[in-house]
């Protein structure tokens, strides 16, 4: 994966390399109240030049609408774990268990850097949900 065809470091820049992930098979009871969502990324970049980072957005409607983006710190050149969100972070919206099922939940990851020649490696994407 690379940083796309533009040099903007904005998470919402359209000329960035983006990838969708889904089918997390989250076992949520239909009566669950969602308290928070956490996304784990295991990733690195080929260099820190251009301040490479990953931006993550969530969708509960199959990708029709998206949450505001959250971004990692600058990626290092050795694989590390980056965690976005948390046990009490709902990413700016209210979720239902059905939205977090395989038909609804999408994770969109954008590769962002201020240089065009940055290469990214993403080895793991995980989603966990805190609920009652």
Segments (PLM) and residue ranges:
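Disulfide-rich extracellular domains of secreted proteins
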Residues: 1-132
